[in-house]
Amino acid sequence: MLMICGMYQLFGNAFITVEGERLPGIGILDVTTQGNAKRMIGPVVLRTAYGDVVGYENHSGSTQLAPGQQSFGMVRSGKGNNGSDGTEGAVTGNVFGSYLHGPLLPANPRFADALIKLAVERALGEPFRPAQIDDEIADQARTRQVRRLVRR
């Protein structure tokens, strides 16, 4: 399951509004989000288990991972979960939470393939061996984006 932005926050323990009201989440991801008046907006590059992942963030929530909660990736460029600890997103089992909008899956075929593999293997209970697909154009576009953003 891939949870983006508000769903990522909802899958956490709680969202604390700008006014200080604590709204409970469903607690699948061990994260807590504090709403802010200022938004974190812009392109992002992450280092992940699936290689470099590119996307676009646009969120006002500042998310803190609890000790032991695995992040989706480490920020190479951008703000990530909170603009300070270098993490982005959270992963528990087959649940991925992230602030990365934009063409996340088409721009990152290794990650997209991994999500499909998880879903198919869970549904069928057997290994998934997809046919080879030519991802060269997506790989070239992602590589250019990484080089452009990380050089700053």
Residue ranges and their predicted role:
Residues 1-50:
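Cysteine-nucleophile active-site neighborhood
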Residues 2, 27, 56, 96-98:
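Hydrophobic/aromatic beta-strand patches that form the interior of the parallel beta-sheet core
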Residues 5, 59, 101:
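Histidine-centered divalent metal-coordination motifs
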Residues 33-36, 62-65, 103-107:
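Short, acidic Gly/Pro/Ser/Thr-rich loop/turn segments
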Residues 39-42, 55, 97-100:
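Short, flexible active-site loops
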Residues 45-93:
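Catalytic beta-strand/loop cores that center a nucleophilic Ser/Cys/Thr
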Residues 94-152:
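Acyltransferase
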